[in-house]
Structures are given as structure tokens and as C-alpha cells.
Amino acid sequence: MTSVQNNPKGILFILLGMAVFSVQDAMIKFIYNDASLYELYFGRTLVAWFLLVCYMKFSKQKINLKTHYPFLTILRVICFFFGFSFFYVSLTYMSLAMANALFFSSPFFVSILAIIFLKEKVGIRRWSAIFAGFIGVFIVLNPDFNNFDYMKLAPIACALCYSISMTITKYTSDKDNVYTQMIHLYIGATIISILFFIFTGEGQFNSFSDPTFQFIFREWFTNP
């Protein structure tokens, strides 16, 4: 597998993406008491669909749904969808700053997966930076195993799922272009969100007093 390396450009797009995610996460943190998790996910997906279609039309990109890696594509979609579900759920009981700090364990997982599945080499400087970051995550997690709050693992579960999704994205990018991969993500998110609406959208399972479970099972399309 070969690919053209353009690290500065890649870093720039990562920073822009993280900035957008930060705004989105802050909005979810602000409104989670009045909405359902997968209602928000569905709305997020519709906005993403609109922006992607507009961009592809403007740049004259062809819509191609075919994938050369059907199993990996399904796995990537599932990991991405439920990975960020873990993160959004964590915002109901921890600060946005802490959730993001724990999510930044993702470089550790990405590096391990890249070595195993992509055969990439990670130098000592990058390992040093990753290790330092992981120590920071460990400090934030504060694992007192006698009184450990396992709910803190949700952002780390998100980081692991995200890392698997990104590793698959890199692996399949030799035959599936970026637009095809994004379309697959949005198709998957749309289908899974609709399934959640069918089975939980009327709030029939929302008999919980806990804000986290209320966020997951709250009725869709209701105003507070």
C-alpha cells in the first residue's frame, strides 16, 4: 500500500476538524437535557449530508457508493457511530474539558493499531510525546481502583472506537476515496439513527431518573 505523504496539510485539517468538533461538543453539552442523543446525532448527520453534497456539487465530484472493503466499511461505520455515542453520553456527567482530556488517549491507540495493521514505523520522539500524553490521561483518570468510577471510561471507549475507525479509513483509502468513505459514514449514521427512532423515538423506554439514560431514551421531536 502506497500513499503520498503531506503531513503539514494533514495536521492543518486535523486541527480544523477538532475545532469544529469542539463547537459541536459544546452545543451538545448545552442542550442534552432537552433532546435525545440519537435525535441530535440524526440532526448532525443531516447537516453533514447537506455540506458534503454542496461541496461535491461545487467541486464536481462524482458520488460513488461502491466500496472495495465491504466488511471493513461496516465495521468502520459502527465503530465511528457508537464511539461518538460514548463521548456524547459522557458529557451528561463530566465536564467537556475532562471528556476531551480522556479522549486524547486516542493517539496511543492509533499508534498501536498503525504498527500492527498498517506496518507503520513510529519513532522515539513520537512515542515520547504519546507516552507523555498518556501519563496526562492517567492523571486525569485518577484510577483509585478501590473507588473507581467506571463511567470515566466512556471517552476512552470513544477514543478506542475512533482509533479503529481511523485505522480502517487509512487502510481502505488506497481504493475507496475520501468522499466515498464519508458517504458511507453518513449512510450508516442515518440508518442507525432511524432504527433508534423506530424502537425508542416515542420515549417508550424512558422510565429513568438518571440524566444519562434520559438522554439516550428521551422522546424525539419534543420541546421542553
Residue ranges and their predicted role:
Residues 33-39, 86-103, 178-179:
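Structural motif at transmembrane-helix junctions in multi-pass transporters
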Residues 18-23, 53, 77-85, 107-112, ...:
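Hydrophobic/small/kink-forming positions within alpha-helical transmembrane segments
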Residues 26-37, 141-150, 201-223:
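Membrane-interface helix termini and inter-helical loops of multi-pass transporters
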Residues 125-142:
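Hydrophobic transmembrane alpha-helices of multi-pass small-molecule transport proteins
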Residues 1-16, 49-75, 124, 187-224:
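Membrane-interface interhelical linkers
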Residues 29, 38, 52, 147-205:
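Transmembrane alpha-helical segments that form core, pore/gating elements
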Residues 106-128:
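C-terminal transmembrane-helix exit sites in multi-pass transporters
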Residues 59-97:
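Specific transmembrane alpha-helical segments of multi-pass solute transporters/efflux pumps
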